C-alpha cells in the first residue's frame, strides 16, 4: 500500500529531522489544549491524527482538546489589540481571549504564517511584530485559573509541488512560506517559545510521497486525511522529542473524531446571529399566542439557544470521557443522560392557524397553472418520509433527480436523531418518483449542491464538501472539504443555490450578517462581510468575490443560453442583470446601487430558473422563473428581452399559483428542467416560515412535509432524453448542439470525467467540422470555447475566432472568457480595446467589466474608449454607464 510505504518512510524521515525536535514539550495531567490559527489547524480536528497520538502517549492525563481555529485566521486578529479583519466572526461571537477562557486553555497551540505569507518580503517585519505581540499577550493570559497559558508555535506547512496544471504552482508559494517559517522560528526563539517547523517536515514528506506516486494535499496547500496522517507523527516527534506511539489507534481516533464533531457543532454553530448575535435578542411570549397581555413572560432566542449550547458543551465533555477510556485500553459508551434541560415555549400562532395539510394530490386542486400547462405530483412525504423541507434540486447525468432535504430547519438541535440529507430519486416513465436513495445523511443545513465530475459539491457551512460514491451502491463513501470558511451566522442566508456558469465555474452566495473568510492557494483569504456571490473554479480551486453588493440574501442565480446571468436578492425579490455589477472591486468595498431589470409584483423569492425546453411553446423559451412564498405563493413567469447593453423583464401569466386560503402551506422553493423537458419544482410545504417573525425554536416549525411537482404542456410531446452518462467524448460534444441549456451543462459535466487533453483534442476536431451555414454555428463554436474554459486549457486562436463572431452574443461571451484568461493570453488589453469599440453595447459592457480586473491605468483608457460608440457619450446606455463608473472606481488607484 502506498500509504503504508509512506509511513515506513516516515520512520526514516525522523532521523533526518532530529534538529527540529523540541527539548521535549510536556503536557501535565488534566490540562486543556486549545488550537488556534488557520485552516491547517482547522482541518486537524476533522482528521484527528495528532490529537490521537497525544492521547495514546499520555493515556492517564485525561487531556482536553478544543479546536478554535478557522480558515483565514491571521495572527493580527490575536494580539493585545486584535484586528477583527483578520479573525472574522459573526456578531458577538466573542474574541479569541473570550474563547480561550471559555475553554479554560492551559496550553495554546498556534498555527500561523500561511495567510500572512502572501504579503511577501514587505510584510515580514509587520508579521514578526504582530507575532511577538501575540506571544506576549497570550503568555500573559490566565485562561484556566491555574496559571498563565503556555504556548507552542507551529509554522505553516509547505506547498506541495505538482505537475498538475490545474494546481497552483508550489515554488512561488514556498519562497514566501520558507521566509515566514524562518521568521516564526526567530520570534519563537526570542520569546523562548517552543516551535515546530512544519514547513521543513512537510517538504521532506512531499518528496518521499512523490516517490510512491502519492500526493498529500488536494489543492497544493491543504492536507488530505492521508497527508494529515503522515504529518502527525513527525509533528509529534518535533514537539515531544520522541517517536510517536504505534499500533492500531483506529478506536481511539474514532472517539476523538466523534468528540471533535460535537465540539465543531458547538464552536461553529449554525445560526450564530440568533444564538449570540443581533437576533438573539428577539423575544416572544412563553405562552405564545395564548399570552393574555403584553407584559406576559417572554423568552428570547438567546435564552433557548444558550440552553442548547450548554447541551453541546456537556455532550462534548461526555465524549472526552470516552476518549480517555479508550486511550487507557478500555471501552466506554457515551452517556448523555446528564444533558441540562432546554427551555420551551408555545407557538406565537394560535392553534387554529395550523390546519391539516392537504395531500399533494388534494393541493393540486387549489393550484392554477398557465394556460395549456398541467401539473402532477411527483413525490410527497407520505410516500417518502425523507422528503422534508426540500431546498434545492437538480438532475444528474443519469437523469436522476437529486434533492437537498432540510428537515432540521432552521438547524439541528443537540439531541436530534433525524438529520438533513441529500436524496436521489429514480423516476418512472410517468415522471413520478419510484425509489429514493439517501446519498448523504448526517447533514446539518445542506443549503446547496452542484454536480462535479463523478461526484457532487455540497454546501454545509462553514464548508463545501466534494462527495463521491466510489463503490457504486448509490451512497457517498468518500468526501473531502474543498472550501472552508463560509460563515453560518444565519441559515436563512447561508451559502446556497449553487449554479454553473457555461464555462465550468460555479457560483454560491451568502447574505447579510455573514463574515466569511476562505483560504485559497492563489492569494490572501477571500474575505467578505454581509452579502456576496462568490465564483469558484472547482477544477483549479480559484475563488473570488463575484458580486459583492448590499444584498440581504442572494438566493437566485441563473444563466441564459449565452451566459448572461440574472441575480436575485431573495428578501426583497430584487432581480438584477449580472454582468453589469460583477466586475472586480477590491474588498471590503462593494458595488453601488443597480436598477432592477424587472419590477417584481411580490416578495420574497427562494429560488429561480429559466425555461429552456422545446416541450414548451416557442414564446416560453428563455422565460425567467421566479418562485415566491409570501402573499403570492407560486412561480412568476417573466419574458426577458434585450435592453441595450442589458436585459429587461415583463411579467407574464404565472407558471403556477396557489390559493392561499386553501393551501397556505404551499411554498415553491426551487425548480429544474428535466431531461424530458418538463419542469419540476419543490414545495417547501410550511405554514410557519420566517426567521425573525417567530422564535427560532417555535414548535410550529414543521419538520416532516415536502413535495415535488411536475409541469408539462398539454398537446406537446415530451423530449426524448439525450443519453449523457457513460457516453464517449464525440457523442457528448454532439450533445452541445442540443437547444436545452441543462442538457448542454450535463454534457459538459460528463466531459469533465474524461481526460482533459483528449477532450480538448476532440473538441478542436469537432469545432473544425461545424457547418458555418448552420444558424446556430456561433453558439456551437462558443460551446467549444466554453469546453476549453471548463478544462482550464487556453486556445487563443479559438478565442479570437469567437471574439470576431458575426453574432454579438458570441462576441460578448468570448469577452467574458478573455477576462478569465487575461493572465494567459498575449496582450489581453489590445484584444479588449477592440471589444470596447464593438458595435453592440453588450460586447462593450463585457469589455468594460473585464478591464476592472487589471491593475494598470491603461485598462481605464480601454474602458473609457467604449463611450466613443455611444450615440450620445454624455448620456450613455444605463448599464454601460453603471459598469464604467464601477470599473473606473476600481482602477482609479492605479497610475
At which residue positions do the language-model features occur?
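Conserved catalytic region of serine esterases and O-acyltransferases that act on ester linkages
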Residues: 28, 45, 59, 146, ...
Amino acid at each position: 500500500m502506498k500509504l503504508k510505504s509512506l509511513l515506513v518512510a516516515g520512520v526514516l524521515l525522523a532521523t533526518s529531522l532530529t534538529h527540529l525536535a523540541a527539548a521535549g514539550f510536556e503536557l501535565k495531567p488534566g490540562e486543556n489544549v486549545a488550537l488556534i490559527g488557520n485552516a491547517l489547524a482547522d482541518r486537524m480536528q476533522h482528521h484527528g491524527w495528532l490529537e490521537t497520538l497525544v492521547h495514546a502517549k499520555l493515556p492517564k492525563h485525561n487531556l482536553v482538546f478544543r479546536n478554535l481555529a478557522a480558515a483565514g485566521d491571521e495572527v493580527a486578529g490575536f494580539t493585545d489589540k486584535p484586528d477583527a479583519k483578520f479573525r472574522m466572526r459573526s456578531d458577538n461571537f466573542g474574541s479569541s481571549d473570550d474563547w480561550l477562557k471559555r475553554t479554560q486553555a492551559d496550553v495554546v497551540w498556534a498555527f500561523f504564517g500561511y495567510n500572512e505569507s502572501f504579503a511577501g518580503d514587505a510584510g515580514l517585519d509587520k508579521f514578526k511584530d504582530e507575532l511577538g505581540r501575540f506571544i506576549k499577550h497570550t503568555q500573559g493570559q490566565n485562561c484556566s485559573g491555574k496559571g498563565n497559558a503556555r504556548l507552542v508555535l507551529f509554522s505553516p506547512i509547505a506547498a506541495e509541488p505538482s505537475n498538475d496544471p490545474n494546481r497552483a504552482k508550489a515554488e512561488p508559494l514556498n519562497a514566501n512560506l520558507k521566509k515566514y517559517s524562518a521568521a516564526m522560528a526567530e520570534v519563537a526563539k526570542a520569546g523562548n517559545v517552543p516551535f515546530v517547523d512544519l514547513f521543513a517536515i512537510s517538504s521532506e514528506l512531499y518528496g518521499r510521497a512523490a516517490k510512491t506516486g502519492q500526493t498529500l494535499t488536494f489543492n497544493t496547500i491543504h492536507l488530505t486525511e492521508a497527508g494529515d496522517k503522515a504529518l502527525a507523527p513527525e509533528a509529534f516527534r518535533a514537539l515531544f522529542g520522541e517517536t510517536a506511539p504505534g499500533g492500531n489507534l483506529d478506536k481511539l481516533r474514532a472517539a476523538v473524531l466523534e468528540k471533535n464533531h460535537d465540539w465543531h457543532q458547538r464552536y461553529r454553530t449554525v445560526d450564530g446571529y440568533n444564538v449570540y448575535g443581533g437576533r438573539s435578542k428577539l423575544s416572544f411570549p412563553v405562552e405564545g399566542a395564548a399570552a393574555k397581555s403584553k407584559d406576559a413572560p417572554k423568552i428570547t432566542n438567546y435564552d433557548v439557544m444558550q440552553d442548547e449550547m450548554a447541551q453541546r458543551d456537556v455532550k462534548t465533555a461526555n465524549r472526552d470521557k470516552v476518549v480517555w477510556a479508550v486511550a487507557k485500553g478500555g471501552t466506554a459508551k457515551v452517556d448523555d443522560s446528564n444533558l441540562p434541560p432546554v427551555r420551551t415555549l408555545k407557538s406565537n400562532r394560535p392553534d387554529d392557524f395550523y390546519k391539516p395539510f392537504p395531500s399533494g394530490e388534494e393541493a393540486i386542486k387549489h393550484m392554477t397553472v398557465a394556460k395549456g400547462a398541467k401539473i402532477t405530483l411527483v413525490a410527497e412525504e407520505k410516500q417518502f418520509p425523507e422528503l422534508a423541507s426540500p431546498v434545492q434540486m437538480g438532475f444528474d447525468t443519469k437523469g436522476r433527480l437529486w434533492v437537498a432535504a432540510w428537515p432540521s430547519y432552521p438547524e439541528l438541535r443537540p439531541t436530534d436523531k433525524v438529520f438533513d440529507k441529500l436524496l436521489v430519486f429514480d423516476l418512472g416513465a410517468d415522471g413520478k418518483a419510484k425509489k429514493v436513495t439517501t446519498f448523504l445523511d448526517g447533514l446539518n443545513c445542506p443549503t446547496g449542491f452542484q454536480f462535479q465530475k463523478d461526484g457532487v459539491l455540497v454546501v454545509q457551512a462553514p464548508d463545501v464538501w466534494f462527495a463521491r460514491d466510489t463503490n457504486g451502491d448509490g451512497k457517498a463513501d468518500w468526501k473531502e472539504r474543498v472550501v472552508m470558511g463560509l460563515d453560518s451566522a444565519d441559515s436563512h442566508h447561508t451559502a446556497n443555490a449553487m449554479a454553473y456558469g457555461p464555462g465550468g465555474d460555479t457560483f454560491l452566495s451568502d447574505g447579510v450578517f455573514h463574515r466569511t473568510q476562505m483560504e485559497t492557494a492563489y492569494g490572501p483569504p477571500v474575505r467578505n462581510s454581509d452579502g456576496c456571490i462568490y465564483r469558484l473554479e472547482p477544477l483549479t480551486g480559484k475563488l473570488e468575490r463575484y458580486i459583492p453588493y448590499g444584498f440581504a440574501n442572494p438566493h437566485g442565480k441563473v444563466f441564459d443560453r449565452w451566459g448572461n446571468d440574472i441575480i436575485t436578492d431573495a428578501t426583497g425579490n430584487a432581480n438584477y442583470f449580472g454582468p453589469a455589477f460583477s466586475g472586480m472591486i477590491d474588498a471590503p468595498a462593494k458595488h453601488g446601487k443597480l436598477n432592477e431589470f424587472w419590477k417584481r409584483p411580490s416578495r420574497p423569492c427562494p429560488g429561480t430558473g429559466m425555461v429552456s425546453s422545446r416541450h414548451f411553446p416557442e414564446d416560453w423559451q428563455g422565460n425567467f422563473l421566479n418562485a415566491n412564498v409570501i402573499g403570492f405563493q407560486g412561480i412568476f413567469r417573466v419574458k426577458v428581452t434585450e435592453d441595450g447593453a442589458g436585459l429587461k423583464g415583463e411579467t407574464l401569466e404565472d407558471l403556477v399559483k396557489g390559493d392561499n386560503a386553501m393551501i397556505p402551506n404551499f411554498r415553491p422553493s426551487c425548480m429544474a428542467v428535466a431531461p424530458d423537458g418538463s419542469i419540476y419544482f419543490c414545495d417547501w410545504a410550511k405554514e410557519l416560515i420566517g426567521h425573525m417573525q417567530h422564535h427560532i425554536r417555535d414548535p410550529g416549525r414543521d419538520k416532516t412535509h415536502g413535495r415535488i411537482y411536475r409541469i408539462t404542456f398539454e398537446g406537446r410531446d415530451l423530449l426524448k432524453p439525450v443519453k449523457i452518462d457513460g457516453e464517449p467524448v464525440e457523442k457528448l460534444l454532439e450533445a452541445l448542439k442540443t437547444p436545452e441549456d441543462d442538457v448542454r451543462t450535463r454534457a459538459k459535466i460528463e466531459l469533465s470525467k474524461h481526460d482533459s487533453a483528449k477532450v480538448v483534442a476532440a473538441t478542436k476536431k469537432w469545432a473544425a467540422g461545424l457547418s458555418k451555414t448552420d444558424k446556430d454555428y456561433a453558439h456551437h463554436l462558443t460551446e467549444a470555447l466554453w469546453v476549453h474554459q471548463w478544462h482550464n486549457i487556453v486556445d487563443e486562436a479559438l478565442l479570437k475566432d469567437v471574439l470576431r463572431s458575426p453574432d454579438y452574443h458570441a462576441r460578448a461571451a468570448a469577452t467574458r472568457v478573455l477576462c478569465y484568461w487575461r493572465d494567459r493570453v498575449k496582450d489581453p488589453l489590445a484584444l479588449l480595446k477592440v471589444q470596447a469599440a464593438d458595435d453592440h453595447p453588450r460586447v462593450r459592457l463585457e469589455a468594460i467589466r473585464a478591464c476592472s480586473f487589471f491593475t494598470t491605468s491603461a485598462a481605464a483608457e480601454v474602458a473609457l474608449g467604449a463611450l466613443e460608440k455611444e450615440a450620445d457619450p454624455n448620456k450613455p446606455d444605463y448599464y454601460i454607464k453603471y459598469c464604467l463608473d464601477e470599473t473606473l472606481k476600481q482602477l482609479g488607484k492605479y497610475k
